[in-house]
Amino acid sequence: LSTPLTERVFKYKNYHNLGILLNMKTVLDLHIHSKYARACSPQLTLANIDKTCRDKGIGIVATGDFTYPAWFSSIEKELEEIGDSGLYRLKKAEDNTVKFILSTELSLIYKDGGKARRVHIMVTAPNLKAARELNNFLDKHYNIRSDGRPILGMSCPKLVELCLSIHPNFLIYPAHIWTPWFAMFGSKSGFDTVEECFHEQTEHIYAYETGLSSDPLMNWRLSQLDHLTLLSSSDAHSLPNLAREANVFDLSEEPSYLEIYEIIKTKNTKKILYTIEFWPEEGMYHYDGHRACNISF
């Protein structure tokens, strides 16, 4: 660790059990992928994710890719809800040490303001019923069977409207917001403000994801983000990358989806303790410049 706990930002390269390292506060990785997403490891099964989370001390992990039919089928068969918490555990697991939260990343490509827009959005579902209803709608109108992270010809505000029409506690927020090609603030196809991206649905956006190429200190420089909850997650495409970025929350002994949702929605800084950060300098999009001229700013 190169920075003290009081700065609420961790930077690390080598780690073993984060739960022990962080004095047993809950580590949440809210953005990962399955073996069905493009360029992702075939080892990303629910059983392997559970085991890796136990090894690393990750308490709550995203399922990723719940819109992909084969993966959703695995989720339904291999996971079971813990009470009525909206969190899930592996059926064959010995205990509830690792809890799964239903999530997916959607790639939205559409036109707005006379420009082509490409934005990746995180969607977290409150339960299987809500996720299934969203899947059924998307399967009727879009192709969700070609990739774990499907491409939809839908706008950001329309997605928010759709999710909230199914269940009011869907959590929708922009992923890796600075990525140039597929992000809310992307230089190639993004927007200049949160409001420009989400229009009349902006009031329902409660968070944003930093992405690997930026850290909290960089994002805190933009005042329009001040009212939103900053989240950092791994976007893992393989097991070793789980929790390379993550969030550390102070949760109850028996956490629920609703507890996590409310903490993020209200930006409860008493419960959001800090994030675990990858070195942003190693992110693909950290520096500006011109590769052909060997110039980096």
For the regions a language model picked out, list residue spans one by one.
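Short, positively charged and aromatic/hydrophobic N-terminal segments
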Residues: 11-20
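Extended substrate/RNA-proximal surfaces in nucleic-acid metabolism proteins
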Residues: 25, 73-206
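Histidine-centered divalent metal-coordination motifs
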Residues: 31-35, 67, 176, 237
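Histidine/acidic-residue-rich catalytic or RNA/ligand-binding cores of hydrolases
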Residues: 38-40, 72-76, 182-189, 220-221, ...
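Divalent metal-dependent hydrolysis catalytic cores, especially in the metallo-beta-lactamase
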Residues: 51-71, 171-173, 207
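Short acidic/histidine-rich active-site segments
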Residues: 228-243
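Cys/His-rich short segments
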Residues: 272-297
